Amino acid sequence: SMYQLWKMILQETGKNAVPSYGLYGCNCGVGSRGKPKDATDRCCFVHKCCYKKLTDCSPKTDSYSYSWKDKTIVCGDNNPCLQEMCECDKAVAICLRENLDTYNKNYKIYPKPLCKKADAC
């Protein structure tokens, strides 16, 4: 679910997901997609592409199990679609952490009309 994604992002980055990434660049947040502005935005682009592969579950509402062990996200005992969703969320949270050093405050609330058409997944 969105709540689990936000929690993973907080655990990995130390940043509150909604204010930090909710409107970041062209790909972070609901419904947006465009040519990534930077590495952080590319994390979100890849995450949206990961979600597009999910056919039997809904990322916004369905919940999966995971745990936080030794500062590591461990996806739990889920059905195949929920497991894949958990792995998508885990990957974006780690990607955002790995790119914290290039997080650009100028992209925090980026006007979506300025986004150019995205590449295909």
UniProtKB/Swiss-Prot annotation:
Which residues are marked as site: Hydrophobic membrane-disruption site (MDiS)?
Answer: 114
The record ties this protein, via SMART domains, to: PA2c
| Residues of the site described as Cationic membrane-docking site (MDoS) | 112, 117
What the entry lists under InterPro entries is as follows:
PLipase_A2, PLipase_A2_Asp_AS, PLipase_A2_dom, PLipase_A2_dom_sf, PLipase_A2_His_AS
Q: Where is this region: Important for membrane-damaging activities in eukaryotes and bacteria?
A: 105-117
User: Which terms does the record give in the GO molecular function aspect?
Assistant: calcium ion binding; calcium-dependent phospholipase A2 activity; phospholipid binding; toxin activity
Q: What is this protein called?
A: Basic phospholipase A2 homolog GodMT-II
Site description Important residue of the cationic membrane-docking site (MDoS), residues in chain: 105, 108
UniProt function note: Snake venom phospholipase A2 homolog that lacks enzymatic activity but shows high myotoxic activities. In vivo, induces a mild edema when subcutaneously injected into mice foot pad.
Predominant location: secreted
- One Gene Ontology cellular component: extracellular region
User: Which cell locations does it reside in?
Assistant: Secreted
**UniProt entry keywords in alphabetical sequence:** Disulfide bond, Myotoxin, Secreted, Toxin
Q: Which PANTHER family match?
A: PHOSPHOLIPASE A2 FAMILY MEMBER (PTHR11716), PHOSPHOLIPASE A2, MEMBRANE ASSOCIATED (PTHR11716:SF9)
Q: Does the keyword GTP-binding apply?
A: no
Enumerate the Gene Ontology biological process terms: arachidonate secretion; lipid catabolic process; negative regulation of T cell proliferation; phospholipid metabolic process
Q: Which cysteines are joined by disulfide bonds?
A: 26-115, 28-44, 43-95, 49-121, 50-88, 57-81, 75-86
The record's section on SUPFAM superfamilies has: Phospholipase A2, PLA2
Q: What else is known?
A: Is not inhibited by the gamma-phospholipase A2 inhibitor (PLI) CgMIP-I (AC P0DQP7) and by the alpha-PLI CgMIP-II (AC P0DQP8).
- Source organism of this protein record: Cerrophidion godmani
